[in-house]
């Protein structure tokens, strides 16, 4: 088996190993990336997801590299070489899969969790992912974003105000 084929088989095997049960859709809210902001108190980047009905938002603190990746995709500003999220998109596509949706599923001990739902030749696969990585992939693939309803009530973090230097949609 050629090295490239072996690599693709190993990636597909890893995706299958991460398979878990499908999550319920009844308690999910469709959201979109509203903006990337900086937390005024810490200077940390925050991705703000807004309920598509426009009445609620959820702020998730993320890393600078992920914020840069999300912002560059929001503004269609592609670097000359692929970053990690571009690579993941390419691997999924080359394995004849697609990202069907992303769901931010829970908040546990101050950390948000999400799943990347993939349609693969063998069926649907849910892969645990950091929300920032899952959001970056959703933006690159056009996959819809969802947040579990309970997370809007569970968070007590204020959404950072919008400033002039933020990356908005």
Q: Where do the protein language model's features map onto the residues?
A:
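Divalent-cation
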Residues: 21-64, 68-169
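Bacterial N-terminal signal peptides
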Residues: 7-17
